[in-house]
């Protein structure tokens, strides 16, 4: 080699070294320039993925999900190995061998930059995609690419490959609000990622490249091409064998949109819990993956929803058929696709599906359903018993021909039912698929009764004509021990109206408010045997604005009446006279102790008849005090809130009944009556009885099942003394046994109690009641304050809903009663005057210092009628409030 050639080579060598040094210095300069602006990779270990707020029942059934991004993070161990192979084949086959950067990919990106002036394909590894998704924008800029490279190198140093892959699996956007592959699997296939097959895994692995372009919903053909390319890559890389490839490559595209499946239909509960979570944590509640665990019991919630819907439908059917919801233009019937689209826009309400009448014959209809089926609705499936609605109190004559009511294009409602034919000589029973209760096949038929003999059922599926009720209702049930809401339904269907009538509809409770006035009287010194005159009374008071002449239902008066009888017969005059004697200020103060707000209570005598506007939740809180022995509890819904890792962020500490704690004062006045001879009273009998021989009751404690749990909670204050609560419990049980709540005798339980309520019109129907297990209020009425119709009372409209729910809720539970306090004795009295007697009469319970005096026996005067002896009354109607109150 010549000297000249050697010098040239040496010069080139030095030039190369200088170039390398310059490049190194340039890269170092870029690194030093960009380094301060790079985020900390360590933060990836504690990264908070945007995860929606989820609401659960107490038994962890999903009730609701709130948030813009659907994400369900999973660990790498929960990710199927074949799916991981599909991701690597699609995105980064050398993931486990490179250091975070692909030189080949970078060279390709650099070539694009030189040729076009922009970076198009990116050349990104999985690590670089993680860096971009967590820290950087998706904009294709040169500086961002350097940041991406530097971050990727740091990530590879700080995290393991599995940790990086787990971040990728959970973070990346995959279309349709789905972030992460677990959420995407649920969106596109309605399954967890572990439950998909190889073809579906390959389809999912194709989404990150372009979630819109390769979306199996928006572009199924392009998504199929991408899937098949990934399957070929998996075969070439040895991830799958030829048989697996052949089977998967021919699989059809099966993706379809799946909304998040809820385990429990409780939208009113979900909305209440959402609001409370936002009140506690602000808007972070929507993104930080909080889990709200409510107090709701899923079984009771389903029973409550079914009971309310069934009760409203039954009430509605009693008042006639209002006709089709709408009539479509005839030309729509010629376009089946447009017809189906229209049907799919009509929401299913209460399980009632919309259908369009396509043909009408005198005794049947042909109906198009939203699933493209055309069914025949025979005369016997709801048509034969139609009586047209005229008003809430009047119906037309029974329909003789379907052509008189229906025409092609009519939109009607249908219920899908299962018909169990139990035998040739027995009637058929219709059981709704959407309702747990037996449902008559013909909802508009007049109720009939008949015995059926058990036989092997033959099950067939049918459709029955129905209609969405116009009346609304609410039901709420709480645990008397601490106020935990176990079930709440705020209306017929949340899709129909988001207005929560259980918590927002303040309506007049009518006679169901009377027990609070009676309790104030018992606490003040009255007894269940105190005599009050049930006679006409007229008031001329300025705060009543006019002359007020309250009446009893039917305009009848009983004269001198014991308080017990006055309550279960719901005598208005007795309630008014009682309140008048107590004084309004005292009564209002006492009633306030049940949790009612003073500002919501009427400041006149009409409060004795339930003229104050209250919500079902407020009413059930008051009745819980009768159920738990006299304590005021506060209803609550959210038991605890967990973060995304399951750590407790919030734990409710409700007021709790605690039998073992020192009892706080009641705040009531001390009674000044002289005690009677207790030894003498013991001879007359112990126990609880309302007109019958004393019977021994099986007593179970009403306090918390876990005493240690209650000790950490604040103690519930008393609303009334234990003695008053016990006496009121006894009197309210008589409402079931002998009064306006007798329909509940069908439950065949002795531990239930409550009170009906009906307001003028009638416009509102109530039943509030309880067992020691649950306190429950049910309300029925119109949002427009319209009248419910003739012969509709609390006992006919609301009580059946309460019975339906409580029968299910208490099924299998033994009877449970309040323990008799030490200060209670049972005494034989003369029912005509409430005095103690030794001859005949009936038994009554008293506080030991309020036992009445003994009467002078007169054999010619002491004759007791069935009415005196509290025998069951045959008048099932209850009182209504006079129009002057409204």
Where are the predicted features?
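Beta-lactamase-like hydrolase cores
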Residues: 32-49, 197, 311-323, 343-352, ...
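Active-site-adjacent helix/loop patches that line small-molecule binding or acyl-intermediate pockets
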Residues: 134, 296, 532-537, 551-596, ...
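Soluble, non-transmembrane domains of envelope/secretory-pathway proteins that act on or interact
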Residues: 1-3, 254, 259-260, 329-337, ...
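Active-site SXXK
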Residues: 87-88, 234, 304, 362, ...
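Short, well-structured active-site flanking segments
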Residues: 96-106, 179-182, 241-244, 453-461, ...
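A short, well-structured edge-of-sheet supersecondary motif
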Residues: 52-58, 79, 196, 353-370, ...
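Non-catalytic, structured segments within soluble enzyme domains
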Residues: 27-28, 32, 118-371, 578, ...
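N-terminal type II signal-anchor transmembrane helix
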Residues: 1-56, 94, 113-114
């Amino acid at each position: 080699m010549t000297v000249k050639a050697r010098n040239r080579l040496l010069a080139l060598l030095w030039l190369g070294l200088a170039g390398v040094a310059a490049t190194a210095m340039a890269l170092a300069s870029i690194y030093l320039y960009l380094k301060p602006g790079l985020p900390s990779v360590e933060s990836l270990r504690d990264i908070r993925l945007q995860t929606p707020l989820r609401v659960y029942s107490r038994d962890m059934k999903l009730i609701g999900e709130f948030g813009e991004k659907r994400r369900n993070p999973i660990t790498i161990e929960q990710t199927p190995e074949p799916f991981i192979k599909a991701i690597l084949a699609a995105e980064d086959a050398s993931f486990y061998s490179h250091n975070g950067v692909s030189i080949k990919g970078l060279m390709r990106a650099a070539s694009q930059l030189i040729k076009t002036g922009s970076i198009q394909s990116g050349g990104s590894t999985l690590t670089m995609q993680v860096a971009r998704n967590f820290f950087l924008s998706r904009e294709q800029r040169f500086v961002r690419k350097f940041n991406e490279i530097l971050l990727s190198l740091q990530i590879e140093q700080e995290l393991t490959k599995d940790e990086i892959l787990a971040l990728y699996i959970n973070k990346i956007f995959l279309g349709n609000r789905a972030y992460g592959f677990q959420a995407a699997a649920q969106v596109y296939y309605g399954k967890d990622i572990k439950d998909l097959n190889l073809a579906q895994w390959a389809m999912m692995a194709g989404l990150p490249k372009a979630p819109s372009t390769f979306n199996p919903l928006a572009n199924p053909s392009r998504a199929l091409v991408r899937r098949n390319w990934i399957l070929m890559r998996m075969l070439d890389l040895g991830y799958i064998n030829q048989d697996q490839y052949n089977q998967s490559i021919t699989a059809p595209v099966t993706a379809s949109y799946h909304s998040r499946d809820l385990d429990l239909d409780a939208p009113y509960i979900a909305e209440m819990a959402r609001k409370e979570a936002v009140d506690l944590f602000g808007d972070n509640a929507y993104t930080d993956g909080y889990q709200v665990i409510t107090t709701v019991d899923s079984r009771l919630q389903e029973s409550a929803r079914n009971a309310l819907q069934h009760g409203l439908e039954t009430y509605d059917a009693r008042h006639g058929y209002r006709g089709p919801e709408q009539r479509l233009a005839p030309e729509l019937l010629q376009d089946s696709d447009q017809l189906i689209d229209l049907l799919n826009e009509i929401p299913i309400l209460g399980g009632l599906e919309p259908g369009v009448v396509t043909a009408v014959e005198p005794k049947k209809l042909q109906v198009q359903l939203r699933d493209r089926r055309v069914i025949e609705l025979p005369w016997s499936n709801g048509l034969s018993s139609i009586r047209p609605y005229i008003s809430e109190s009047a119906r037309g004559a029974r329909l003789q021909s379907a052509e008189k009511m229906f025409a092609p294009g009519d939109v009607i409602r249908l219920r899908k039912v299962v018909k169990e034919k139990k035998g040739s000589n027995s009637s058929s029973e219709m059981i709704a698929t959407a309702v747990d209760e037996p449902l008559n096949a013909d909802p508009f038929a007049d109720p009939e009764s008949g015995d059926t003999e058990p036989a092997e059922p033959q099950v067939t599926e049918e459709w029955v004509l129905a209609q969405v009720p116009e009346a609304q209702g609410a039901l709420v049930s709480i645990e008397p021990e601490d106020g935990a809401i176990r079930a709440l339904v705020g209306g017929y269907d949340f899709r129909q109206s988001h207005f929560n009538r259980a918590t927002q509809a303040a309506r007049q409770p009518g006679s169901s408010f009377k027990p609070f006035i009676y309790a104030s009287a018992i606490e003040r010194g009255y007894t269940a045997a105190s005599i009050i005159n049930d006679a006409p009374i007229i008031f001329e008071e300025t705060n009543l604005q006019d002359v007020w002449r309250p009446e009893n239902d039917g305009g009848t008066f009983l004269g001198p009446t014991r308080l017990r009888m006055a309550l279960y017969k719901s005598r208005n005059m007795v309630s008014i006279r009682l309140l008048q004697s107590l004084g309004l200020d005292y009564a209002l103060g006492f009633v306030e102790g049940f949790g009612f707000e003073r500002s919501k209570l009427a400041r006149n005598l009409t409060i004795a008849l339930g003229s104050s506007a209250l919500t079902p939740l407020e009413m059930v809180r008051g009745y819980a005090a009768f159920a738990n022995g006299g304590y005021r509890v506060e209803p609550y819904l959210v038991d605890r809130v967990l973060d995304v890792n399951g750590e407790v962020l919030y734990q409710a500490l409700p007021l709790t009944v605690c039998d073992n704690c020192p009892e706080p004062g009641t705040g009531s006045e001390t009674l000044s009556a002289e005690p009677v001879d207790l030894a003498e009273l013991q001879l007359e009998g112990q126990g609880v009885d309302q007109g019958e021989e004393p019977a021994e009751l099986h007593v179970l404690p009403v306090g918390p099942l876990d005493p240690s749990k209650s000790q950490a909670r604040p103690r519930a204050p008393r609303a009334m003394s234990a003695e008053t609560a016990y006496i009121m419990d006894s009197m309210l049980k008589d409402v079931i046994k002998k009064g306006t709540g007798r329909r509940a005798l069908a439950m065949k339980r002795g531990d239930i109690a409550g009170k009906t309520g009906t307001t003028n019109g009638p416009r509102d129907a109530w039943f509030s009641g309880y067992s020691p297990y649950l306190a429950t209020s049910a309300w029925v009425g119109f949002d427009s304050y319209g009248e419910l119709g003739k012969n509709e009372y609390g006992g006919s409209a609301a009580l059946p809903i309460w019975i339906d729910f409580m029968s299910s809720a208490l099924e299998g539970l033994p009877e449970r009663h309040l323990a008799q306090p030490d200060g209670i004795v049972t005494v034989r009295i003369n029912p005509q005057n409430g005095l103690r007697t030794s001859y005949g009469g009936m038994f009554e319970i008293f506080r030991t210092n309020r036992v009445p005096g003994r009467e002078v026996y007169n054999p010619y005067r002491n004759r007791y009628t069935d009415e005196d002896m509290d025998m069951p009354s045959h008048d099932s109607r209850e009182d209504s409030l006079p129009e002057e109150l409204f």
